[in-house]
């Protein structure tokens, strides 16, 4: 497989909320040597059903194999690959930035430009919370780096397809 064949893919996977399902899904990737870029698991609007948002860099051939293998895992209900142009994807980033009385106004100005927010202020630092598309978060981080990034944590992407169509019909 040539490196040019590899691209970023986002899978939305509905699973029954049963013990060990996350381990079984990640184990399938691990056993086959596939790398997960990010994985988010959360409850859906339907009790007992979770949505896994899995981001991977892989070729189309590998993605076909991944989908086939995931479909073999019994508590998996449905798998959809979300196309980038038909998807709303967001992540959460929290950054602790060195900020004292002298440079704090510049840090806050940068945060405001990105519509992020300061969620904690200490004498020598601030904690910034931002949500958005990966590009926006990367751009904010680039702006904050010159001030001094003390700590950084970022969630994986969560994503939904655009428009009225849902992955699964709502339960009544």
Predicted feature locations:
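Long, contiguous binding/interaction regions
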Residues: 1-50, 55-172
